[in-house]
Amino acid sequence: MAKKVAVIGAGVSGLISLKCCVDEGLEPTCFERTEDIGGLWRFKENVEDGRASIYQSVITNTSKEMSCFSDFPMPEDFPNFLHNSKLLEYFRIFAKKFDLLKYIQFQTTVISVKKRPDFASSGQWEVVTQSNSKQQSAVFDAVMVCSGHHILPNIPLKSFPGIEKFKGQYFHSRQYKHPAGLEGKRILVIGIGNSASDIAVELSKKAAQVYISTRKGSWVMSRISEDGYPWDMVFHTRFSSMLRNVLPRMIVKWMMEQQMNRWFNHENYGLAPENKYLMKEPVLNDDLPSRILYGTIKVKRRVKELTESAAIFEDGTVEEDIDVIVFATGYTFAFPFLEESLVKIEDNMVSLYKYMFPPQLEKSTFACLGLIQPLGSIFPTVELQARWATRVFKGLCSLPSKETMMADIIKRNENRIALFGESLSQKLQTNYIDYLDELALEIGAKPDLVSFLFKDPKLAVKLYFGPCNSYQYRLVGPGQWEGARNAIFTQKQRILKPLKTRTLKASSNFPVSFLLKFLGLFALVLAFLFQLQWF
């Protein structure tokens, strides 16, 4: 059984891995190359090599109730969508609550992770680290890689003929921090992901003109959904997930298109996606349609060629006097401290069982966390990954044979291509609730809805028709939390708390609304009875 665990990285995945190790009675040591926790979500004015980078205005795309760890709800006064600084505050509260900082060695870089000579029998690893120009070696029973996949910028310059002639400024979105210095410029943003849209919207308030160039377009969603609730509280329910899984794909695709176009007609705005795939990760942006409507952002097709100061697009249109090009073209990733044969990366893909375990190892003592792009919050996802990994390390859960794992990897990749396509940004894409349930099933934490229907029907209804948040995976099994049921029933209270900052008189709309519904139902009954007279 593993005892000593090396955790590489003190971002979101690293912090929750530390907690899960402690929960399972393991002895973790976390190596963090910087001076603080938070990883991607800790904003710094300067870009650092080997570390993820964000712009100052980043807001979460998933709401607080869908993003919190399963036994630690966010404070009720926190906004529903958090600025990066507020999310970092939550991580600090979390780390302090569970006393995690004592396990972290800051400003320590992992140089190498190698199997010990007796790995086939011991499953142990030799980890070499460096701190203050001094290297040290230590032996661990298991390793959890939590270093993320938003580190190496992808800038496909070869796809932009004439870039060498361009006399303006160009850079990857990783280098963007805020609009300072770009006021009054004519700016071209390449890409239509979340970062591209955020940056374009922010720049459009300061620049002379902003253009977005997109090859295939994208659906755009608001964070605000029905009745003003966060989008993911409405979208991610077991009921809606079931419908998406059982209905024919073309029907689901049509339904989603109708839903997306309810906010605005994407075709009229030049944003309608040109792909045949069922699911393409939508862009979450509340302001993009407005900025297009104002004319401060113009949507263009793919760039065919660049000149010294102009962009020529594939439809033949030309935009002159371009000052700046921002490449919001995604990321690739690498693990320089690992042997290539351990986690082989090909075309931004890794062959890991359920995105976590290398299938070829004799002992299951190594796991990658967070190498996934769920259509939902990454935080509950990596938490379940960590809960499973630590139980595998302890020998409480086991992995199938190498052949079974390889077959699963191949099948999963085929399904991913059918659903999401093969673009760079889709290589790690997966369905949200399905994947969470898979992991929960492995550790015995998936709630049995039929069982709850008999012993706690109110809870069963919440589980099936309500938001599928992380609390559901603390109701049963190992790590069961006695506060999980209450957290599920009080989530609406925590959603509304930061919104109700102005006291209002009690609304009298309910009786009127109820009366109208009653009269409507009565009218339907009368119409039905009247119809029967004609038979």
From Swiss-Prot:
Chief subcellular location equals membrane
Question: What InterPro entries does its record include?
Answer: FAD/NAD-bd_sf (IPR036188), Flavin_mOase (IPR000960), Flavin_mOase-like (IPR020946), Flavin_mOase_2 (IPR002254), FMO-like (IPR050346)
Task: Tell me which cofactor or cofactors this protein depends on.
Answer: FAD; Mg(2+)
| Catalysed reactions, as listed in the record | N,N-dimethylaniline + NADPH + O2 + H(+) = N,N-dimethylaniline N-oxide + NADP(+) + H2O
**How does this chain sit within the bilayer?**
Single-pass membrane protein
Endoplasmic reticulum: present as a keyword of the record?
A: yes
List, alphabetically, the GO terms of the cellular component aspect.
endoplasmic reticulum membrane; membrane
Could you say which tissues express the protein in this record?
Answer: Lung.
Q: Which domain of life, per UniProt?
A: Eukaryota
Glycyl lysine isopeptide (Lys-Gly) (interchain with G-Cter in SUMO) cross-link located where? 492
- Entry EC number(s): 1.14.13.-, 1.14.13.8
Which GO terms label this protein's molecular function in UniProt? Answer: flavin adenine dinucleotide binding; N,N-dimethylaniline monooxygenase activity; NADP binding
- In this chain, NADP(+) is annotated as bound at 60-61, 195-198
One matching Pfam family is FMO-like
- Residues binding FAD are 9-13, 32, 40-41, 61-62
Q: Which residues carry this modification: N-acetylalanine?
A: 2
> What are the TM regions of this chain, as residue ranges?
510-530
Q: Which UniProt keywords apply?
A: Acetylation, Endoplasmic reticulum, FAD, Flavoprotein, Isopeptide bond, Magnesium, Membrane, Microsome, Monooxygenase, NADP, Oxidoreductase, Transmembrane, Transmembrane helix, Ubl conjugation
Q: Where in the cell is it found?
A: Microsome membrane; Endoplasmic reticulum membrane
Stated role: Catalyzes the oxidative metabolism of numerous xenobiotics, including mainly therapeutic drugs and insecticides that contain a soft nucleophile, most commonly nitrogen and sulfur and participates to their bioactivation. Most drug substrates are tertiary amines such as prochlorperazine and trifluoperazine which are N-oxygenated to form the N-oxide, or sulfides such as thiourea and ethionamide, which are S-oxygenated to the sulfoxide.
Name the UniProt record assigns to this protein? Dimethylaniline monooxygenase [N-oxide-forming] 2
* Species, as recorded: Oryctolagus cuniculus
Taxonomic path: Eukaryota, Metazoa, Chordata, Craniata, Vertebrata
The gene name on file is FMO2
